[in-house]
Amino acid sequence: MQYRRFGRTNLQMPVFSCGGMRYQFQWQDVPMSQIPDENQGNLEAIINKSLEVGINHIETARGYGTSEMQLGKILPQLPRDKIIVQTKVSPGQDVREFRRKFEQSLQFLRLDYVDLLGIHGINTAEILDDTMAEGGCWQEAKKLQQQGKVRFIGFSTHAPTDVIVKTIATNCYDYLNLHWYYIFQNNWLAIEAAKQHDMGVFIISPSDKGGHLYNPPPKLVALCSPLSPMVFNDLFCLSHPAVHTLSIGAARARDFDEHLKTLPLLDRAEKILPAIIERLQGEMINCLGDNWVKTWSLGLPSWENTPNHINIRSILWLRNLAIAYDMIDFAKARYNLLGNGGHWFPGQQAKEVEKLDLTACLAASPHADKIPHLLAETHRLLSGETVQRLSSS
């Protein structure tokens, strides 16, 4: 395993982390007596494999159902100074509820403290304002830190980049968890801002939200050859020193194996990556046109400023991936989450977009004339059965 300094925490963070939202029994709290021995045994095998390969950062959340309770059966048996434990708690206007949830997390984990507490889901400017308000959840997290129950405070986010940068600019957080990977590089400005504030940077879900890379289409496999799409994406992310760790949401012990193939390649990333990136970029241009690839995202409105709250940017992004890389299954899964993703994946589908007048909201786009047609086309291509967030399903 390789390790990187996790920003101003000074923790030596493994470049891969063991994410805790895939191995738990279910998404709702239930008594430990209801958890099958087979499921608990699988979780413990995952943690043991993680530690065996040097991944000593174990990440979970109060919102991950039985994850914390199940971890509490194994974590107290481990040398406390050899593991890094992170949990996350969603903020709200009731700080007493925030504290109650955190205390429940600590009780389930059977630990005296966590190394990292993430304020979970600073996804909008309103949530940020509420969190940072006098007497808000950030101040409550600081009290927990002063009481020795938390070592470092961070935040996790699915927010637009400007909200992430604004959160970083408070200089109140030691680290952040965010989305950034090859197919979604929008948040690079946030990573640069985090570097300026010496914050730890944890990449959320690079293999799932990064393209369902555990089940890639043959075309993407060919474009990423000789690496698998998963290893390519890992190497791409970790080739940037400002990125410190990638989450592996393991559902079974063998889920680490493919990721570990990245480690011996890290020193040669600058020689390996350019040819693959050139192929990927070239195929995007070949399928969609050079002008579109360079300018499609210019002048697009936010979903809040679009009739029917259509998330134009996300829909066109998914269309690009589906057409250029045959990432149909991934694009369908994300598209059909629109309307059910809340502030984690906001906005609506392009249903009946033909009946809407998008002229005003697309006035700044160089492709205003064709985007309505493309949205309708994408809806026909991707619409299907409604998808819910994992924690809601």
What are these regions (language model features)?
Residues 62, 66, 90, 158-159, ...:
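Short beta->alpha linker loops
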Residues 68-87, 137-148, 202-203:
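Alpha-helix-loop-beta-strand connector modules within alpha/beta enzyme cores
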